[in-house]
Amino acid sequence: MKYGQIKPITTVHPDIRLAPSYTRKAVMAGMRLLAPLYLRLGLRFSSVTSLHAERAAGAFESFFSGKNRLLIAFRHPYGDEPQLLSYYILCRVRKDAAEAGIRMTRDPHALFIHGYEVPRWGGAFLRWLLPRMGALPVHHAKTDAAGLNRIRKAISDGQYPVALSPEGQVSYSPRSIPRIEQGAARIALWCAEDLRKAGRPEKVLILPVCFRYIPVTRSGHSAEKLLNLVENAVGTLSDSAGPTTDSPRSAGS
């Protein structure tokens, strides 16, 4: 399909089958090596700055020491927040902990909750990667008892914290929150109830994470290409001209 053409979807694909979720240390080690390159070359971020990093480091330390269970709730206004947060957890939390004088006993990681539609449009590599990183799939459009039970067990007994977006999907609203689903609060309450029934002393912490994107320079070429695509699709033409090069972004979390 050539650039500027939009092909309608006329077929229905069968539901996908994912491997059982189980973290592979070799895969995680590989992702720690590749994540900085992907962030720079794939997502085009020039730098990542973390604010109040000692809070995240302290939350992970309390989880690994058995004092608390941890649920990470992150804003999802665009499409690359899960990748950005995964990079930060894999590659930066331990360094930030050392700078804050916090001793981290294990390599940080998090189990991300995702909809079944993500590996469907994400391609074969993502379908291979997500289960091996311990990601937790769930159906959004129908009742998924098996998926919810899997999440409930992970937050109560898993070896890593659980991460999800309270917005439920990409919100396309970086400056405001259009809505918040009940998932994060409900999962935290489930965990607290399970801990109480089991007589366990841990508390449940919710770590909120937000993102701010700062363009290093004006990056108008990508917007220009998207505008041309839309105009071609609806049969209009534009005489506007924009920059011809993309520029990296920086992000704060």
List PLM regions with ranges.
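Soluble catalytic domains of membrane acyltransferases
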Residues: 8-14, 23, 27-253
